[in-house]
């Protein structure tokens, strides 16, 4: 519990004059303005990246992802995998303490993974861990995890921000309320959570990495209004803000006290086409639509330059991603292909969007105008979350009204399986997952399944390349852009940046 002692009481104790004789060091307190509120401080029960990002203040995993989305050791020192791909033996870092004084060890790992893989706990991230058969303690610094079936991307699952190590003592003490009482091994510990206003964390004196953290506190403050978030940087009320609205970026860039940063992301924006429905069952129609979109112009019109044209169906930062020559803008070629497909005068269709914010509206309007130039009349609908859940995610192929669908995907494991399987595997048509193209190819299914059964990087590369080659050629999507992430911070704040999955990195953050 934080104790506050007033200046009056210090004076009464005869201490005020001696304290005043020494200049006080300025506290290194940072305020971060973010775009939405937090749902929980339990990473296993959070579906939103922001809640998991804030939870990194308190929590760490066995592994993590660096700024290039490559796996790195955190609380683990290394691992081995059995020849059959079923057993992972992980060596743990010694001498690490939780913020409540409990030891971090193999028993703590078992407690967390047993909880995460138990369907009776109804945790939102259960699907990440449902392949775990059992977790065993070999010795205090070694844990053995056995899977139900081989899954070669498993270490990426352990590197996912959801896979945090929570103090077993805290789990026992707080139970289902652990989301309000985070206790981890991270650099900061919870000071205050005002659920309508902010989360404040303070330096954890017992942190295992010497010399860290350098900040005294971080206050995470949700500010949903774009203009207010930007204004807080201008006035010094905040030292870091994300996301920065595109229309505010130029203004903030002119402020000599601020630095505007556009960083790479793994957020791919695309339009899927329902290949089970006419006219999108015709490959020439799908090719025509890809030629019809001027992606360079789209980057300027809808994203103010803060995006790059897509060069594949998997963003370049993701492991095993393949890049291709981007589709050129060629409306004449598009009209020729439509004619060959039997649609010389074009056709009418619908274009839905998974979001209704201003950027999505701009993409819809731009695409509608581009399609009109080749004779396609698209009726556009920007959906809210409820509509999307009911009309897109909740309906199977026979009852689905999806034809063209603008959306996005971020593979936060950093590995190709989560970028491909939910979106292209035959078994993942809605309502199972998010294959809104209702795409199906036996070779792609076979390649994706085989890639999870091998730990040979060369074989995985071959399989993922073959799958992506087929998907790119068959064009169930109109790949549009990969977004850039726009943030801004005070120039005296260093080591604080945005990860490609829109999480935050602040391990080495300092206020000069």
Curated annotation (Swiss-Prot):
SUPFAM superfamilies: Periplasmic binding protein-like II. This is Glutathione-binding protein GsiB. It comes from Salmonella choleraesuis (strain SC-B67). GO terms for molecular function: peptide transmembrane transporter activity. InterPro entries: Peptide/Ni-bd, SBP_5, SBP_5_CS, SBP_5_dom. Part of the ABC transporter complex GsiABCD involved in glutathione import. Binds glutathione. GO terms for biological process: dipeptide transport. Belongs to the bacterial solute-binding protein 5 family. Keywords: Periplasm, Signal, Transport. CDD domains: PBP2_Ylib_like. Residues 1-26 form the signal peptide. GO terms for cellular component: ATP-binding cassette (ABC) transporter complex; outer membrane-bounded periplasmic space. It holds the Pfam family SBP_bac_5. It is found in: Periplasm.
């Amino acid at each position: 519990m934080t104790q506050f002692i007033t200046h009056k009481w210090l004076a009464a104790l005869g201490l005020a004059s001696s304290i005043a004789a020494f200049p006080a060091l300025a506290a290194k307190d940072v305020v971060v303005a973010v775009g939405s509120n937090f749902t929980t401080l339990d990473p296993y029960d959070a579906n939103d990246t922001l809640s998991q990002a804030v939870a990194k203040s308190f929590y760490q995993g066995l592994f993590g992802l660096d700024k290039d989305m490559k796996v790195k050791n955190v609380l683990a020192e290394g691992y081995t995998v059995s020849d059959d791909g079923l057993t992972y033996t992980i060596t743990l870092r010694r001498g690490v303490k939780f913020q409540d004084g409990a030891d971090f060890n193999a028993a703590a790992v078992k407690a967390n993974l047993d909880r995460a893989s138990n369907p009776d706990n109804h945790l939102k991230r259960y699907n990440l861990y449902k392949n775990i058969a059992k977790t065993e303690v070999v010795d205090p610094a070694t844990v053995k995890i056995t899977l139900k079936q081989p899954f070669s991307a498993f270490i990426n699952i352990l590197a996912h921000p959801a896979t945090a190590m929570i103090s077993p003592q805290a789990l026992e003490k707080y139970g289902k309320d652990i989301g309000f009482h985070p206790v981890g091994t991270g650099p900061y510990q919870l000071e205050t959570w005002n659920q309508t206003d902010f989360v404040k964390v303070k330096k954890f004196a017992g942190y295992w990495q010497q010399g860290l953290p350098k900040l005294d506190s971080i206050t995470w403050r949700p500010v949903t209004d774009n203009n207010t978030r930007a204004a807080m940087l201008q006035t010094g009320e905040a030292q870091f803000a994300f996301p920065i609205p595109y229309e505010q970026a130029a203004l903030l860039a002119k402020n000599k006290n601020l630095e505007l940063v556009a960083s790479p992301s793994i957020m791919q924006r695309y339009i899927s086409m329902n290949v089970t429905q006419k006219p999108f069952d015709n490959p020439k129609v799908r090719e025509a639509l890809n030629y019809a979109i001027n992606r360079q112009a789209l980057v300027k019109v809808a994203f103010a330059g803060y995006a790059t044209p897509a060069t594949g169906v998997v963003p370049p930062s993701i492991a095993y991603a393949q890049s291709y020559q981007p589709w050129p803008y060629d409306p004449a070629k598009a009209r020729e292909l439509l004619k060959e497909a039997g649609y010389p005068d074009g056709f009418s269709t619908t274009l839905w969007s998974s979001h209704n914010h201003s950027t999505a509206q701009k993409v819809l309007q731009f695409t509608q105008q581009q399609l009109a130039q080749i004779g396609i009349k698209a009726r556009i609908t920007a959906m809210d979350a409820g509509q999307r859940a009911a009309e897109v995610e909740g309906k199977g192929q026979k009852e689905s009204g999806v034809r063209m669908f603008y959306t996005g995907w971020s593979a936060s494991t950093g590995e190709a399986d989560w970028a491909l399987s939910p979106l292209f595997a035959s078994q993942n048509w809605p309502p199972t997952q998010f294959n809104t193209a209702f795409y199906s190819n036996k070779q792609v299914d076979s390649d994706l399944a085989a890639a999870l059964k091998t730990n040979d990087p060369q074989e995985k590369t071959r399989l993922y390349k073959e799958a992506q080659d087929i998907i790119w050629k068959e064009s169930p999507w109109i790949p549009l852009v990969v977004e850039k992430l726009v943030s801004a911070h005070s120039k005296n704040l260093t080591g604080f940046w945005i990860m490609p999955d829109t999480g935050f990195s602040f391990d080495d953050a300092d206020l000069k």
